[in-house]
Swiss-Prot record:
Keyword Transcription regulation set for record: no
Gene name, Swiss-Prot/TrEMBL: HSP70
Species the sequence originates in: Encephalitozoon cuniculi (strain GB-M1)
GO cellular component: nucleus
Role played: May act as a chaperone.
Pfam families per the UniProt record, alphabetical: HSP70
PROSITE patterns hit by this protein: HSP70_1, HSP70_2, HSP70_3
Listed name of the protein: Mitochondrial-type heat shock protein 70
Superkingdom, taxonomy of origin: Eukaryota
One Gene Ontology molecular-function label: ATP binding
Keywords in alphabetical order: ATP-binding, Chaperone, Nucleotide-binding, Nucleus
Amino acid sequence: MSNADAPSRKFSSSIIGIDLGTTNSCVSVIKDGKPVIIENQEGERTTPSVVSILKDEVVVGTQARNRILMHPRNTIFASKRLIGRKFGDPEVEKYVKGLPFDTMSHCNGDVWIRVDGKKYSPAQIGAFVLSKLKSSAEAFLSHPVARSVITVPAYFNDSQRQATKDAGRIAGLDVVRVINEPTAAALAYGLDKSARGNIAVYDLGGGTFDISILEVEDGVFHVKATNGDTFLGGEDLDNEVVKFIVEDFKQKEGIDLSNDVDALGRIKEGAEKIKKELSVSCTSKMEIPYICNSQGGPKHLCREITRSEFEQIAKKIVERTIAPCKRALADAGLDSSDIKHVILVGGMTRMPYVRRVVKEIFGIEPSTDINPDEAVANGAALQGGVLMGEIDDVLLLDVAPLSLGIELLGGVFSRVIRRNTTIPFKETQVFSTSEDNQTEVDIKVYQGERSMVADNKYLGQIKLKSIPPLPRGVPRIEVTFESDANGIYRVTAQDSITKEPQSLEIIPSSGLTEAEVERMVEESERLRHLDEMKRRKAELIVSSSELLRRPPTELERIPKNYLDRLGKVVKGEDFDLKEMEEVLLSAKKSMS
C-alpha cells in the first residue's frame, strides 16, 4: 500500500499502534475499523531496530543495519534486550561481552551504551526507532501524531515497562497505553476471526519469549496466565550459529575468529540469512570471501548447513520455551487439550522446527493465518481504536506477569500481589514494625517468584516517617499496591493508627530521572530539527535540478539571477535554505 494514497483516506484513529521489537519494529493505524500497516520512508512494512550514530548524524533502520560491518562500534542493535536492566545482571554481563559496541554502567547501575565517548540509555536508542516510526506515520496520515499504544513483552518487569514509556516520551509520543505483545496479537487474531474459547499465544521474537493463555468470549479478551523469558530469542540463535561456524572454521583452517570483530559481524550477517533461508529450504550456504588473512594468503569461508544441522543448533534454545508453556497452562488451570487456537508471533515462529515443537506442546496445529511480524502492531492499533471509542464491544483484561511484595525481617519476600492477577488492581495488606519505638520504616518493594528478596527484582522503596513510638508489632502499617492498565505499579503506605496523610519518599532503583528524560527530549527534538533541515535541503537540490532541466523556452521566463543561484545550489555551494526555498518558489511562479 503506497503512502502516496494516504491523503485520500479517512483514518478513524489518531492513536498509532507500535511494536517496538528487538530485531524489527512496526507501526499501524486504524482505518474504517481495521488496522493498516504503515510503510516507512523506504517502502518497508517493518523497520530494523538498528541505530547508527556518526557524530551528530543518527540513522535508523535498513540504512543503519547496512553500517554494522563498516561501523560496528557506532551501530546499535537489539537495544531492547538492555532496556530497564542493570549492568550487573548476569544475563546482561554475559550478553554484552559479545557486542561490538561499548556498554557501561550508569550512575544508578543501569546498563547504558557509549558511542564515541557519548552516553546513551537504551530508552534513548529506542526513542530513535520510535521517532522514525512516528515520522512514517505522520507522512502517511498527513498530520502530526502525538499519541500511541506501544507493546512490550508480557514478561517485562516494571522497570522495563517504565523505560519503554520513557522512550516514547523522548520520541515526542504520549504513550496512552502499554499492552503486552501476546495480548495485542490475540486481539488482532480474535477480532478478525471472531475467535472464542481458550487461545495460546506463542511469541518467540528476536530477543524475548512470551507465552500467554487467554479466554476469548464475546469481545472480552481475558488473560488467564502468562510466562516467558526476557532473554530468549532469535539473537541467541544467531549467536549459536556464529559459534558453530567459528568452531567449524577453526577445525578446518586452524584459525580462531572468535576475537575478530569484523569477521564475527560478517558471520552474524550470514547467520541471519541462513536462518531465514532454512525456514523454506532444506539447505543453505554461508559464503564469505576474504574472511581473514593468514601466512598463506587470504582465507575464504564457505560452509553449507542443512536444515537438520540447523535444527540441532536451535534445539536447546527452542526447548527452553517448553517449560514456560507448561507453567502458563498450569497457572491458567488448563490442560493442553483445552486450547482451541494457538497463535504464532515473532519471526522465529516461521521455522518449521519451532512449529513442530509448538504442536507437540499443545497437541494442535498452530494457526498461520496472521503475519507474525505485523500482528502485534495491528493489535496495538486496535487497542488505540478502542481507547478512541472507534471500536466497540472489546475489553482487554491482562495480568501482572510476576508477583509483587515487600521485604520482611530476615530478607523474606512477602507477596502482596500474586502473579497472573488481573490488572488493573488495588490490594492492601497490613504490616508492623520490627523494633520498639520505631518511628520510620523503609518499605522495600520487589518483583519475582523466589522466597528471598535477594533472588527477586528490586523495584524501589518507600520511606514512611512519623510513626508513633510504640512497642514493636503494635503500629498498623497499610501497604497498598496499585496497577494501572499499563501494568505499571504504584505503592503507597500509611500508618493506620494516626490516619494522618504521610509524606512518602519513593526512591526508584533504576530508570531515567526527570532531568535525564527532559535532556533527552531536547536532544531528540534538536536531532529531529537537523533531520528536517537535511530533508528540506535535499528536496531543494532535487527540485532545483529538475527545474533547470526544463525546456529553454520555459526557462526564458525565469530571471537570470534566479537561475544562476539555483545552479549554485545544484553544484553543492553553500546557501541559505529559507532564502533559496523562496527563490525556487518565485522561479516556479515566473513560469506559470
